[in-house]
């Protein structure tokens, strides 16, 4: 089975997003990566960026098909997000101090929530998560949110491919 055929061979569904994202740039990059890994959608909960120009410009670059494959959703706050979450999906927080990603078995239908590098995932959001996972690293500083998302999606695809 070839890596680029993951989605067409029944890769379980997932969505990924950022809690209180600081920059539109990170959202844009995460969306491009999420589309490549077959995400159902990408979202931002209570975004903090005021300059949406990078996001708007990137949207123009995405084809209509790409926009349909991985739509972007913006939520006012965590309660808005939680109220609209479909049943049967498992919320997974990506935060330092959680279960190491190397030991984690991804749920078949997962929603991954990343925190911005300065504040992380809120206590309210963490409490709602069934799992909290972390990316093992040599240093204690957090990963860039886009990099963290890419690592988790790659790990997910490897574990479902094998």
Locate the predicted segments by residue.
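Short beta->alpha connector loops at strand-helix junctions that form conserved
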Residues: 19, 45-46, 116, 133-139
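Structured adenosyl-cofactor binding patch, chiefly the S-adenosyl-L-methionine
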Residues: 125-162
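A short acidic, often aromatic-flanked loop/helix-cap motif at beta-alpha or helix-coil junctions
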Residues: 78-83, 99-101, 140-142
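Active-site/ligand-binding-proximal alpha/beta "capping" segment
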Residues: 96-127, 132-135
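Residues that form or flank phosphate/diphosphate-binding pockets in enzymes
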Residues: 25-26, 120, 143
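RNA substrate-binding interface of SAM-dependent RNA methyltransferases
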Residues: 1-95, 157-158
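Short secondary-structure transition/capping segments
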Residues: 53-58, 104-105, 146
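Conserved strand-to-helix beginnings and helix N-cap segments that scaffold or border functional pockets
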Residues: 27-28, 107, 145-146
């Amino acid at each position: 089975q070839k890596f680029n055929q993951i989605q067409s061979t029944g890769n379980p569904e997932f969505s990924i997003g950022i809690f209180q994202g600081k920059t539109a740039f990170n959202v844009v990059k995460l969306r491009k990566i999420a589309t490549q890994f077959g995400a159902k959608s990408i979202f931002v909960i209570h975004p903090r960026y005021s300059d949406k120009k990078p996001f708007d410009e990137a949207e123009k670059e995405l084809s209509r098909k790409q926009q349909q494959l991985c739509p972007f959703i913006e939520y006012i706050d965590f309660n808005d997000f939680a109220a609209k979450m479909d049943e049967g999906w498992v919320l997974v927080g990506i935060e330092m101090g959680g279960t190491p990603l190397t030991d984690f078995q991804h749920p078949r239908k997962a929603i991954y929530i990343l925190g911005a590098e300065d504040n992380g995932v809120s206590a309210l959001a963490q409490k709602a998560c069934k799992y909290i996972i972390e990316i093992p690293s040599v240093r204690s500083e957090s990963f860039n949110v886009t990099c963290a998302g890419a690592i988790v999606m790659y790990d997910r695809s490897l574990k479902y491919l094998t």
